[in-house]
């Protein structure tokens, strides 16, 4: 799933609406709960100003991902939009345990 900036998105900084900041915190907490439940094992925030805000890998059908993301507080508030791209992986694929800050997509 590719998370993108929605019409109500704003970059972090002193001019960001406090309501947007709260929505993004709720979105992040929800993502961590989805990870803990095994539904979204890989979460990759992107903050390069490109309009792409993140990439996540779900362990769910595209239909289930659509339902899950439709309930996301950031999506509901128009802060984010998303695209679903069904994919597959190789058994055992995972992120390295080393410094996650060095990964590039």
Residue ranges of model-derived segments:
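Conserved, structured core segments of small domains
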Residues: 1-105
């Amino acid at each position: 799933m590719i998370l993108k900036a929605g019409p109500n998105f704003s970059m972090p900084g002193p001019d960001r609406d406090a309501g947007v900041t709260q929505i993004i915190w709720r979105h992040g907490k929800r993502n961590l709960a989805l990870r803990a439940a095994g539904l979204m094992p890989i979460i990759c925030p992107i903050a390069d100003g490109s309009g792409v805000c993140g990439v996540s890998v779900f362990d769910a059908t595209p239909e289930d991902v659509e339902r899950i993301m439709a309930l996301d507080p950031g999506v509901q508030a128009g802060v984010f939009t998303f695209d679903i791209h069904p994919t597959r992986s190789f058994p055992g694929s995972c992120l390295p345990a080393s410094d996650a800050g060095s990964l590039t997509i």
